[in-house]
């Protein structure tokens, strides 16, 4: 028995009365909220309207879930369509089985539809949500822990994952927690994108491409450690080949885009009132209110000064009038004396 290890949950579902709350789905939901929340902050900082990220996510998230499931079912079709299998299980997404490659690809289609409806460029939106997607994946990977799936080779390290379920044909034991490795890697990718965006002012989809490239590096390494059944090409797992191909495409996009359109977009959302301060700068939500207060105070001071000047002029005129009356009386008396 290992002295130290990561225990697996006794079950992957909790019941709130008759309603099942599955750990896998719960992790995905948390990830979506984190991605939308962070993406919204970055979008507003770039000059967009609050709420735009969420509006487009309404399109991107369902498309992404469908794409992720399709990729999994197509690449592991024997789990659902081979002899003795029930094809209906292909629709049971809550039992696990989402391919990130399909989720990103079809999710991008949904995001493109949402962006066209709002009249904004897809690359700018993708840059805003890129680190949030990485953090969302970090949360989502814990769903594999709840389902006791997608772990690595057998090991005796202190952080080994104790697998108690044998539903996938594996012998219960201690294995590399690849879900944890990928979760930590995704956290690092998220912070890398934020730092690089702040340092190099990434725009026109380059922040998103950096996220894709960085994720592929970690995924290729972690995929090599996994021992679950997978298709192989030339002795290499299919997902490794996919990671290599997507990595090269992402790097190529960064290079070509930097030459063709350096810098960031000047306007990310036409008609937005706030031009933004940059994705790396904090958004001063009270700036407009402070400006309005200052303008009001200035107008009040100007009005007060004008009133005082008017009153001062009026008093001077009255004083001049009062001084003129005695003078006129004195002159009249002098003329009378001369006549006498």
From Swiss-Prot:
A Pfam family assignment: LGT
Functional pathway: Protein modification; lipoprotein biosynthesis (diacylglyceryl transfer)
Region Disordered, annotated ranges: 266-340
Compositional bias annotation for Low complexity: 295-307
NCBIfam families attached to this UniProt entry: lgt
Keywords: Cell membrane, Membrane, Transferase, Transmembrane, Transmembrane helix
Keyword Transcription regulation in record: no
Lineage of the species this protein comes from: Bacteria, Bacillati, Actinomycetota, Actinomycetes, Kitasatosporales
GO MF term list: phosphatidylglycerol-prolipoprotein diacylglyceryl transferase activity
Its membrane topology: Multi-pass membrane protein
Entry's EC annotation: 2.5.1.145
Biased composition (Basic and acidic residues): 284-294, 326-340
TM stretches of this protein: 19-39, 54-74, 93-113, 119-139, 176-196, 202-221, 238-258
Family classification: Belongs to the Lgt family.
Subcellular location: Cell membrane
UniProt cross-references to InterPro entries, sorted A to Z: Lgt (IPR001640)
Gene Ontology CC terms, in alphabetical order: plasma membrane
Name of the featured protein: Phosphatidylglycerol--prolipoprotein diacylglyceryl transferase
Function, in words: Catalyzes the transfer of the diacylglyceryl group from phosphatidylglycerol to the sulfhydryl group of the N-terminal cysteine of a prolipoprotein, the first step in the formation of mature lipoproteins.
SS bond list: none
Organism: Streptomyces avermitilis (strain ATCC 31267 / DSM 46492 / JCM 5070 / NBRC 14893 / NCIMB 12804 / NRRL 8165 / MA-4680)
Main localization (coarse): membrane
Primary gene name: lgt
Transmembrane helix listed as a keyword: yes
């Amino acid at each position: 028995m290992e002295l130290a290890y990561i225990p697996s949950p006794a079950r992957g579902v909790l019941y709130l009365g008759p309603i099942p709350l599955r750990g896998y789905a719960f992790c995905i939901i948390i990830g979506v909220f984190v991605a939308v929340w962070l993406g919204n902050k970055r979008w507003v900082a770039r000059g967009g309207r609050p709420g735009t990220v969420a509006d487009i996510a309404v399109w991107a998230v369902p498309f992404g879930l469908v794409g992720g499931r399709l990729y999994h079912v197509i690449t592991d079709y024997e789990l659902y369509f081979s002899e003795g299998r029930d094809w209906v299980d292909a629709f049971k997404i809550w039992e696990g089985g989402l391919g990130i490659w399909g989720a990103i690809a079809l999710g991008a289609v949904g995001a493109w539809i949402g962006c066209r409806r709002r009249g904004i460029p897809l690359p700018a939106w993708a840059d805003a949500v890129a680190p949030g997607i990485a953090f969302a994946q970090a949360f989502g990977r814990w769903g594999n822990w709840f389902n006791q799936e997608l772990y690595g080779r057998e090991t005796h390290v202190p952080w080994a994952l104790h697998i108690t379920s044998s539903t996938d044909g594996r012998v219960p034991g201690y294995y590399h927690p690849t879900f944890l490795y990928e979760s930590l890697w995704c956290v690092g990718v998220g912070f890398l994108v934020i730092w690089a965006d702040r340092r190099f002012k990434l725009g026109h989809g380059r922040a998103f491409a950096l996220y894709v490239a960085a994720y592929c590096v970690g995924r290729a390494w972690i995929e090599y450690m996994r021992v679950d059944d997978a298709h192989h090409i030339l002795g290499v797992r299919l997902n490794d080949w996919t990671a290599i191909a997507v990595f090269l495409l992402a790097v190529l996009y960064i290079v070509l885009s930097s030459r063709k359109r350096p810098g960031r977009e000047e306007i990310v959302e036409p008609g937005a009132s706030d031009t933004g301060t940059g994705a790396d700068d904090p958004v001063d939500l009270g700036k407009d209110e402070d400006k309005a207060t200052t303008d009001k105070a200035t107008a009040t001071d100007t009005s007060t000064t004008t009133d005082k000047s008017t009153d001062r002029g009026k008093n001077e005129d009255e004083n001049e009038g009062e001084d003129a009356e005695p003078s006129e009386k004195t002159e009249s008396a002098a003329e009378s004396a001369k006549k006498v």
